[in-house]
């Protein structure tokens, strides 16, 4: 079953609070990939608190160079070196040279089998990547079109491979259930102002993790000039991207609680279904 596990190790932004640390999200998929989205201060300690070894990470995906997103990275690098490994890091190209000097394997994309991560340019005050995850979950077959085919043929068709049965070449597209989505997608924006050009590049996603630094008490233009978004901006992005699930994070330390954000989110009729996690909250999502 295509199932994602998200653990929110840090849901704040810029300045930490006792109950809201800096941006760090742990993602684990049903295929066994373990990805850390940004590495706020104390990232590896927080991983250990959820019984995840820093050495077990597939990679760390950093959105941009600002310290609230990167202060936890040196510790992860050092720990991996001590354990005989080499950390893989995805980052904007402007960060590659300095990361290479740290001795990490750095890139701006990752692909393994049916899983890939790519950088999409977001609208922040520095060079920044949103990270677009895509999983190929295979085809769902229209049973009326595959009746009588052998099991091996069905397996190959689900994987996206054409088969030859009784001299007839059958492609997955011919026998697919067209109501089923083959690709499932998640986008993590990191820090961004509203970014229509990014929305156009991405198209559609199933899950959107979008920053909502501000609620509704800051002039939208002020938020945008600082490279950030409001709750309303994040909701608009989710609707444009046709996301089923919207997760709001990177909450400013100016807010003593998330109640103001929650009130705004509660006023939105699904879709999207909106979640505003606390630190250490776990969310399981069936794709």
Curated annotation (Swiss-Prot):
Residue numbers annotated as active site: 68 (proton acceptor)
Binding site for Zn(2+) 1: 64, 66, 124, 191
Pfam assignment, any one: Lactamase_B_2
Keyword presence, Hydrolase: yes
InterPro entries in the record: Metallo-B-lactamas, RibonucZ/Hydroxyglut_hydro, RNase_Z/BN
Reactions catalysed, as given in the entry: Endonucleolytic cleavage of RNA, removing extra 3' nucleotides from tRNA precursor, generating 3' termini of tRNAs. A 3'-hydroxy group is left at the tRNA terminus and a 5'-phosphoryl group is left at the trailer molecule
GO molecular function: 3'-tRNA processing endoribonuclease activity; zinc ion binding
Alphabetical keyword list: Endonuclease, Hydrolase, Metal-binding, Nuclease, tRNA processing, Zinc
The UniProt record lists the keyword Thylakoid: no
Oligomer status and interactors: Homodimer.
Protein name: Ribonuclease Z
Organism of this sequence: Pyrobaculum islandicum (strain DSM 4184 / JCM 9189 / GEO3)
Gene: rnz
């Amino acid at each position: 079953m295509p199932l994602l596990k998200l653990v929110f190790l840090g849901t704040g932004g810029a300045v930490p609070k006792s109950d809201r640390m800096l941006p760090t999200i742990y993602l684990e998929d049903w295929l066994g990939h373990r990805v850390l989205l940004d590495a706020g201060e104390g990232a590896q300690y927080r991983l250990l608190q959820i019984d995840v070894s820093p050495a077990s990470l597939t990679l760390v995906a950093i959105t941009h160079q600002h310290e609230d997103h990167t202060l936890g990275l040196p510790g992860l690098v050092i720990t991996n070196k001590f354990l005989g490994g080499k950390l893989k890091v995805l980052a904007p190209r402007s960060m590659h040279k300095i990361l290479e000097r740290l001795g990490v394997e750095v890139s701006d994309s990752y692909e393994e089998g049916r899983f890939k991560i790519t950088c999409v340019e977001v609208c922040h005050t520095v060079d920044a990547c949103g990270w677009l995850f895509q999983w190929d979950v295979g085809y769902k077959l229209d049973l009326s079109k595959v009746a009588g085919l052998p099991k091996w043929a069905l397996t190959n068709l689900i994987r996206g491979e054409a088969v030859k049965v009784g001299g007839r070449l059958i492609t997955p597209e011919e026998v697919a259930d067209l109501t089923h989505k083959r690709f499932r997608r998640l986008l993590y924006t990191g820090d961004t102002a509203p970014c229509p050009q990014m929305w156009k590049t991405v198209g559609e996603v199933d899950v959107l993790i979008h920053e909502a630094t501000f609620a509704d008490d800051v002039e939208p233009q002020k938020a945008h000039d600082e490279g950030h978004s409001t709750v309303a901006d994040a909701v608009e992005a989710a609707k444009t991207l046709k996301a089923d699930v919207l997760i709001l994070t990177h909450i400013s330390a100016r807010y003593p609680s998330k109640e103001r954000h929650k009130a705004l989110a509660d006023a939105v009729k699904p879709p999207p279904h909106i979640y505003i996690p606390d630190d250490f909250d776990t969310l399981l999502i069936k794709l």
